[in-house]
Amino acid sequence: MVQEAVAEVQIPGKNGYLGVLPGHAPLITELSVGELSYRINGFSHYLAMAWGFAEVLPTRVTILAEVAERAEEIDVERARRAKEKAEQMLHSADPDTDYERALEALKRAEVRLDVAGKRGAAAGR
């Protein structure tokens, strides 16, 4: 999706967000549901990410993700419906409800809505 030099990357790792600058020590981390941000020429760009791995090397970051969507690619209405459905599942009294799955769906929908709201990010963000 992005194959160009960036000044900084913020990765949604399994144990929290990881900031990566050029020259970072090598590592591999598992991705969680979250917002990936990166800066090019003073402009911030955002992706909604879910599940996968990131390989960080001093001169390159490689992301292998199951889901990656740019802000402008996100269907906001679909994300709103997914959020409502997940909230209904979480408030359900049905003993067959998979609460962990509903929480993941809610988090993913919220991230998608947050990222979609950042379309056309301004310089310096």
Identify the function of each model-found stretch:
Residues 1-81:
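Compact, glycine-rich, soluble single-domain proteins
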Residues 68-125:
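Acidic/glycine-rich phosphate/pyrophosphate-binding loops and surrounding catalytic core
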